Amino acid sequence: MNCTEEFIAKMKQKDIVINFVQAWRNDTLEESYARLDKPTRLHAYSVSKSVTSIGVGLAVQEGLLRLDDPVLRFYPEYDPAELAPNLRRMTVRDLLMMGCGSKDKMFFWNDAQRLQCRAWQDYFLRNEFPYEPGTRFEYNNFNSYMCSCIVERAAGCRSEEHTSELQSLTNLV
């Protein structure tokens, strides 16, 4: 039995469902397990938030951005005068703290609009922000998504490339 099979067996004993696992060593895929076929779409909300937050921390450590940077610093192509006043005050920290000031979760749950919209950053930036950023907690997947986009813009590469050193983490179970 290989390590992945052992891991899956342990999780089954604990009634934990695992959909997908990969074991990488030195940029080589050593083992893989997939309970579902490739076209199946899954939501990975919480884990992606954690990895994205680490990516922001790495970018801060590298001097690519600061937590108090305004979100619009990374979107110079937008005219602030055409956007919601509270968006102009929103910082990276506000996004990390789930405090962007949105009126609701926007559309990042299960409605059809999510599948129809292709320009998610533009949708976010042109949305309403009736609340002052940082004053109201709203569990909103867009906060983490925008953090990931900001890391990409600051680092000049895809966020998963920027956080590639995380692939070396071992002994997670």
Question: At which residue positions do the language-model features occur?
Answer:
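A short, well-structured edge-of-sheet supersecondary motif
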Residues: C3-D37
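Active-site SXXK
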Residues: H43-D68, L95, C147-V151
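Short linear capping/connector segments at secondary-structure termini
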Residues: A34-K38, P70-D79, W109-D111
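Catalytic-site signature segments of enzymes, centered on catalytic residues
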Residues: K38, F107-E160, S164
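Solvent-exposed loop and edge beta-strand segments that line ligand/cofactor-binding
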Residues: A44, L83-N86, E132-Y139
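Active-site helix/loop module of the DD-peptidase/beta-lactamase fold
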Residues: E62-C100, R126, A155-S164, S168
